[in-house]
Amino acid sequence: MAQHRTLAHPFQFSLRWLSPLLPGILICAAVSCAAILAERFQVRIAGHAWLGDLVLAILIGTLLRSLVSLPVVASAGIKFSAKTLLEIAVALLGASLSLSILKGAGGLLIGGIALIVALSLVFSYAAGRMLGLPPKLATLIACGNSICGNSAIAAAAPAIGAKPEDVAASIAFTAVLGVVAVLLMPFLPQLLGLDATQYGIFAGLTVYAVPQVLAATAPLGAVAVQTGTIVKLIRVLMLGPVIATLSVIHGQSGKGRLKLQQMVPWFIIGFVLMIMARSFGLIPEALLSPVASLSNILTIMSMAALGLSVDIRSLRHAGGKVIIAASLSLVLLGVLSFGLILLTQAA
């Protein structure tokens, strides 16, 4: 009887933990299934997919959020899918990469990424101030556009003592602009004459969030996805030094100090460990394909959650100056990124 009770406790704990998340997870799963079916329908009708399942998941999720009031009970599961499932997917993605790819990045590219982040921060902030935005709001927009979107905004807010309304305004448009960028990105390779590697670099440098990079690069295949992910994660690693610097500048060293695990998220560590495991043959070949499939499924679900988290109507509250500042920042980032590609190509 005691043994039965002992076995029941973990099961009951799992149910208590999963129950609040289940409605939102199921909605994300339904949107993901619709996206996968829509992609297959395109292939059957036209011979190929104009829009991949990753982009479709964002589109369907955004459309659903804009047309229907989602139940409050689903919010926890949607947030879980957008954050935790994404983090797991990114960590697992490391199993599809090896150290040889990382070596190919080279010191010039890594240095270029750091320089672009720094220049983008300075010029984006300057553009925001020229448009009349308050200093802290301009800082949030600069951090969001230059590093990793909403995550950078959320991390920078306590470091600079930002007001909640400034955080909400910057996040509102950054989320929508990120989705727009993902939808337009796949047209750039042909327009700019970029190959898969160059496009991966461009997407990794300009797109806000990791799932959006995956969605933007997927149409060009595995090389673009792998390159874009590596560049994006190197960019994310700049978050720690930037937040530490902002804390000192704004005198928030006590309130805004972040722990190491906040500056270097666990999934980046997991991503690197999976690369190491793959490189040293610690992952059996038979597991590589299932792990890649699981990572892809979780990524689709996280992007469905991303779409379900974007309310286009919130743009009304963001304000015209915020929209212009964020758009100018993104254009500037694109110009700098294209310049880095030309520089690495010449080298």
Curated annotation (Swiss-Prot):
It is found in: Cell membrane. It holds the Pfam family Cons_hypoth698. InterPro entries: UPF0324_pro. The keyword Coiled coil does not apply. Keywords: Cell membrane, Membrane, Transmembrane, Transmembrane helix. The keyword Cell membrane applies. Signal peptide: none annotated. It is a multi-pass membrane protein. The chain crosses the membrane at residues 15-37, 50-72, 105-127, 140-162, 172-194, 201-223, 233-250, 263-282, 287-309, 322-344. One of its GO terms (cellular component) is plasma membrane. Belongs to the UPF0324 family. This is UPF0324 membrane protein Atu0671. It comes from Agrobacterium fabrum (strain C58 / ATCC 33970).
